[in-house]
Amino acid sequence: MLDKIKKVYINNSGAVTVEEDMSYNAGDKNVSFLQINGIDISILTQAKIKTPGGQIITKTCSNVDLGKNVYKQVLVPCDESGVYQVQIIQSSRDKVSCSNIFQYTVDPGIE
């Protein structure tokens, strides 16, 4: 199964631009990623994700370095269908900044 990567761009003010199609399928475990562009990879970056059931999950983003293409990446949960809300949090020694909240959807799988 191929990885399902959705691209997110964050500017210095925290504004978020996302791909047009921000949906995954239920059950796409371990293959669904957010690729986060536009942020400093030397800063600790976490994704705070609210599931459709209201659970809050915090995941640390990893660095991906493909030469000219450097970005952060995080594996996102796709356990249940519905709308997931995400906020990206960057933490350095003297500053914490948060992105605007954006969302992705998980479509139900074949029953």
Regions found by a protein language model. Give the residues of each.
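N-terminal assembly/attachment segments of tailed bacteriophage virion structural proteins
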Residues: M1-E111
